[in-house]
Amino acid sequence: MELNSLTAISPIDGRYSNSTKLLRNIFSEFGFLKYRLYVEIQWLKKLINMHQILEIKKVEKTDILFLDNIFETFNEEDAISVKNIEKETNHDVKALEYFLRKKLSQSKKLSPFLEFVHFLCTSEDINNIAYALMIKNARDEIILPLWKKIINFLKNASFQYRNNSLLSLTHGQPATPSTMGKEMVNFYYRMQRQYHKLKKIEILGKINGTTGNYNAHLVAYPKVNWHAVSKEFITSLGIFWNPYTTQIEPHDYIAELFGCVSLFNNILIDSNRDIWGYISLNYFKQKLIDQEIGSSIMPHKINPIDFENSEGNLGLSNALMNHMINKLPISRWQRDLSDSTVLRNIGVVFAYSIIAYNSVLLGTNKLTINTSQLLKNLDNNWSVLSEAIQTVMRRYTIENAYEKLKKLTRGKKIEKVDIHKFIDKLNIPKIEKERLKKISPSNYIGAASQIIDEIK
């Protein structure tokens, strides 16, 4: 059976392939091979440019272009060649080395230097840098832009709905009113913090040999400062240098990065559930799309499926991330291989998150505010003004203010007239009575509208 979106086992490459196809060039087996090939070539170029390595004679610019072209033209046919070599070697990085050596043998100028391909490197020197570049590209080119779209929706919604008063619910029960805009800005602020944090996380790489001590390096070229060379090479690739490692880069930065992503995802789950609830309360309506069907038997249904889909995929992504956060920083002695199979699933982690982000963006585009329902719920809950009244009473030292409002309102259906009768009987200045009577559930929103102006 040919592999396609219908025959794929995982919905990542099946049902949701349109959302995840951007990841294929990064995290597929082809993508991983190409990133590793890039690292091998860049390291060879670094060695070529080192004047201390006398065995490499002068190389012309055209020869460097030949090297670069091997990477730039790397295609699926080349990847299949590497995999065929791997069938014999049973070692993926060595197979890639042999592939590159074969390519270089076609160059008269470069063929004398075949032994400098993968020179001084353990497989992890290549792999860890490849993963670092893959993660960096996924973060910068895919994840952060999607986060920005979600954050921008929340920011725009904060201003758009800043004056739409909302009956708050604490413990699921009526509470002091807010505005829909203020509720959106709460999520905006939380997600914005994680956005800036993710941008700043240092993605690390190492190239220091079998156990991190440059043993082979110093045997071959004892006068070279390989520690400095390592730093120069790593930072030239646009990532940060880890100077102290075992055979592997310890993956702490991956755990840190996934901690940030999983927290963002949890905030988004919180937002999804709140918006889902507001749809259920009819505070938000969903735009009707004639061709769509909400239920196979109930024709009237318009379900909040985008927010539900997002929540489910965020949960899957977080479950895998939490395993990686706990697993990846731990390796026996100078290394064991248990991280290898886990690292190959980094693309899966990002894929589930990306499916969720795209889904929630679909959902937010269908939302319209239902002002009449918001006001109706507020007008049915005059008891929420008990907080304001008892606070003013306490200001004027009226004894048992809280208890008196509790007796009036708790567990009872209170109307506007009941509140005003109670205010009339209070022993407070007339001007305060008039001020209290001007308060209603829809305008008792504190500074909810104003503080939105402070967001950036």
From Swiss-Prot:
The keyword Lyase applies. Its EC number is 4.3.2.2. Pathway: Purine metabolism; AMP biosynthesis via de novo pathway; AMP from IMP: step 2/2; Purine metabolism; IMP biosynthesis via de novo pathway; 5-amino-1-(5-phospho-D-ribosyl)imidazole-4-carboxamide from 5-amino-1-(5-phospho-D-ribosyl)imidazole-4-carboxylate: step 2/2. Keywords: Lyase, Purine biosynthesis. The active site is at residues 171, 295. It is an enzyme of class 4 (lyase). N(6)-(1,2-dicarboxyethyl)-AMP binds at residues 15-16, 90-92, 122-123, 247, 296, 301-303, 309, 335, 340-344. Disulfide bonds: none annotated. Pfam families: ASL_C, Lyase_1. GO terms for molecular function: (S)-2-(5-amino-1-(5-phospho-D-ribosyl)imidazole-4-carboxamido) succinate lyase (fumarate-forming) activity; N6-(1,2-dicarboxyethyl)AMP AMP-lyase (fumarate-forming) activity. GO terms for biological process: 'de novo' AMP biosynthetic process; 'de novo' IMP biosynthetic process. It catalyses: N(6)-(1,2-dicarboxyethyl)-AMP = fumarate + AMP; (2S)-2-[5-amino-1-(5-phospho-beta-D-ribosyl)imidazole-4-carboxamido]succinate = 5-amino-1-(5-phospho-beta-D-ribosyl)imidazole-4-carboxamide + fumarate. The keyword Lyase applies. It comes from the Bacteria. GO terms for cellular component: cytosol. Belongs to the lyase 1 family. Adenylosuccinate lyase subfamily. Catalyzes two reactions in de novo purine nucleotide biosynthesis. Catalyzes the breakdown of 5-aminoimidazole- (N-succinylocarboxamide) ribotide (SAICAR or 2-[5-amino-1-(5-phospho-beta-D-ribosyl)imidazole-4-carboxamido]succinate) to 5-aminoimidazole-4-carboxamide ribotide (AICAR or 5-amino-1-(5-phospho-beta-D-ribosyl)imidazole-4-carboxamide) and fumarate, and of adenylosuccinate (ADS or N(6)-(1,2-dicarboxyethyl)-AMP) to adenosine monophosphate (AMP) and fumarate. Homotetramer. Residues from neighboring subunits contribute catalytic and substrate-binding residues to each active site. This is Adenylosuccinate lyase.
